[in-house]
Amino acid sequence: MGSAIPQVITPDRATGAQVIDGSLSFFKESNPYLEFTPGSDGNRSTWTISFWALVDPATTGTYNPFTLATSDSFAWEYEGLMYAGNTLYYIDYISQASGSNILWRTNAHFRDTGWYHFMAVKVNNSTFKLYVNGEEQTSLSNSTNNNGQSSHWNKSGEKMFLGGSTHATGYSSHSPGMSQFYFIDGQALAPADFGFTDGLTNTWKPKKYTGTFTGTNTCYLPFDGNSPIGQDQS
């Protein structure tokens, strides 16, 4: 498991922005991760993932997962948001039996080491959106719609990971920090629900989510050091 390490994401209390005073670190050397296995299906067609993460574009490795949902039945059935070097990916291997898979790769690249806000939003079985710092990523390579398939996320018995996994592919993370993780079951939310553009600095800042925490598997993990790691605060 990781440990809570005090960090600050762009502190600027004078602007009235939410200040995040904690994060959870994941380092490859110890292969840490958080794991949850749903006991029942949530909404597999509509959900929102939102979190802040510290990214180093010089990080090595094929894929470094922020989030991953996996099938225990087939080694190559998994879905998750990850990055390799300076590029963000969302990969969904739908079926090992059929060989079908989906890959979204952003053409925009991480230039600087720093905190970024990420969102993955499944609107329905034919619409999926990626956001970085409030901006939808519409310039994508190898992008394919998910052909009406339900998600690995929110499926009873399929493990949901943060920061790494025990998956057969062996993917592990190297993120110096992750904070303010939300998984909202059954809602396709917008960046404005979690952040805003600061008029004084023209930068994307975190905002406290004030919406509803509906759904079977919804959770909120602040990683602020004020509650046990992995304990849902929704």
Residue ranges and their predicted role:
Residues G2-A4, T10-L189, L200-G230:
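Extracellular glycan-associated modules
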Residues F196-D198:
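Low-complexity Ser/Thr/Gly/Asn-rich repetitive segments
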Residues Q233-S234:
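Phosphoinositide system proteins, centered on phosphoinositide phosphatases
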